[in-house]
Every structure is written in C-alpha cells, then in structure tokens.
Amino acid sequence: MNLIEFPLLDQTSSNSVISTTPNDLSNWSRLSSLWPLLYGTSCCFIEFASLIGSRFDFDRYGLVPRSSPRQADLILTAGTVTMKMAPSLVRLYEQMPEPKYVIAMGACTITGGMFSTDSYSTVRGVDKLIPVDVYLPGCPPKPEAVIDALTKLRKKISREIVEDRTRSQNKNRCFTTSHKLYVRRSTHTGTYEQELLYQSPSTLDISSETFFKSKSPVPSYKLVN
C-alpha cells in the first residue's frame, strides 16, 4: 500500500477489508502511475535525466516517460520557453487527456530567468500559457528537489476530487482548484506582450526637418511619435 494517506483507506475491519470510495481508488491508481511527457529545452533537463540512473531510480514512483502527449498525464517543462515555442507547448498540453498535471522546473520556466531581462522573445513564466500545478525553483534544481516536487504532486492527487477539477477546467482552462488563475485574455501564442516592448524608431520614420533640427531642443518622445 502506498505511504500517502487517504481519508478513507485506513478504515479496516477485522476481516482485513478496506472500505474506500471510487474517487480515492482512482486517485491512488493515478498517483502510482504517472506518465510524464518530458519537455526539456535547456540545462535544467539534465538534472531530471540523472533521475533515470540507479542512484535515484525514479521507476519506484511509477514514472514511465512517454513520447506522445496522448499517452501522458504529466508534462514537465524544464528550460526557457520562447514565444515561437509557445504554440507548440499549448498544443501538446491540449492533446493530453484529462486529468493532466504540469510541473514547472527551473527559474527559466517559472519566471523567464536571466533571459527575461533583456530578451524580447522569452515568455515570462510558463503559467501564462498553461496552468501549473507544482513550481520547482532553482537554477538548476537538484534531483532531490525533483523527487520532492513529484511527492507534492502525488499528495495533491491523493486529495483531489476529479469532478471538481474537470468542472473548473471546462469553465476556464487556466483555472484550477489549487491556484485560482483568472484569464484576462486569450492564450498567448507568439505575440505575448508585444505592446509593452520598446522598439527604437527608424530614421526613415522621422522626417528630415525634425531629424536635422539640432539647434532647438526636441524631446525624445516627440521624435518617436
């Protein structure tokens, strides 16, 4: 029996009969056989690859990596996500069957990391594209931290009511019972916050009279506008 506690699995009789509910039985079977889709784009994924070895042995958690999103119920994003990759990531997530879960691994996936400071093509957080269940910070996180994130996800699944999760996601795709995200606009695919980015004006957009009028001070915003 799994070590994760269930509210109704500890009710046993003298005949060693376990009384439970279909929901708890479904949660127990799902948390013991997570099939992840590995979406690694950067160095954080190397730390997850070390779990495959005999030292950490992630097979004991029932993890079976899959190459198809239609056979996976967990997607693990590790590394930087760019705007050009955003449509592919959203499509992979939408092709996964319900119930499905997301683990964001590393600073670059959670906030954009160091590439988000001066990059125009980096998505500032994968949770702007798909709902995230477990955040795993670090640059990069250690394999022990990945195991801890998997344990937290398993505990979340054990206390989950499938009907509530399905009902909430049908109403709003980026809304879960764990973190209440309210979408203000549609999914960002390639044009994420383009209106907030500064683009230096070209000399062709500035008239010659304004450009060569150096004697009178002209504010920079007038040159742009």
Swiss-Prot record:
EC number(s)?
Answer: 7.1.1.-
Q: Where in the cell is it found?
A: Plastid, Chloroplast thylakoid membrane
PROSITE patterns named in the record: COMPLEX1_20K (PS01150)
Q: Which domain of life is it from?
A: Eukaryota
Q: Name one Pfam family in it.
A: Oxidored_q6
Which NCBIfam families does the record match to this protein? nuoB_fam, PRK06411.1
Spell out the protein name for this chain: NAD(P)H-quinone oxidoreductase subunit K, chloroplastic
Species source reads Agrostis stolonifera (Creeping bentgrass)
Task: Give the classification, highest ranks.
Answer: Eukaryota, Viridiplantae, Streptophyta, Embryophyta, Tracheophyta
